[in-house]
Amino acid sequence: MMIKQCVICLSLLVFGTTAAHAEETPLVTARHMSKWEEIAVKEAKKRYPLAQVLFKQKVWDRKRKDEAVKQYHLTLREGSKEFGVFVTISFDPYSQKVNKIAILEEYQ
């Protein structure tokens, strides 16, 4: 009987501390967003304020002497509706000043 109680106490001590450490360490670390990715998400949230961003991906980018363009595809959920939008950002590559932002909802 005494051995059984010692085994139970020891197992609680070992597994209890392991569980406490597991809660402290995050399972998934947040990925750092680039400046332009943050702008794309912010602009999409302006147009769709109640939407939740599920997924974001850079589709393409182009850099010329006087203009750079980046396009992102965002998957959004608004209520039960799930849809995609393309956010295209045009900016000056030297000053980083935004020239134009276009948001186009993906055709369903």
Curated annotation (Swiss-Prot):
Keyword GTP-binding: no
Record bears the keyword Endoplasmic reticulum: no
N-terminal signal peptide: 1-22
Pfam families documented for this protein: DUF3889
InterPro entries in the record: DUF3889 (IPR024987)
Keywords tagged on the record: Signal
Stated name of the protein: Uncharacterized protein YqzG
Organism of origin: Bacillus subtilis (strain 168)
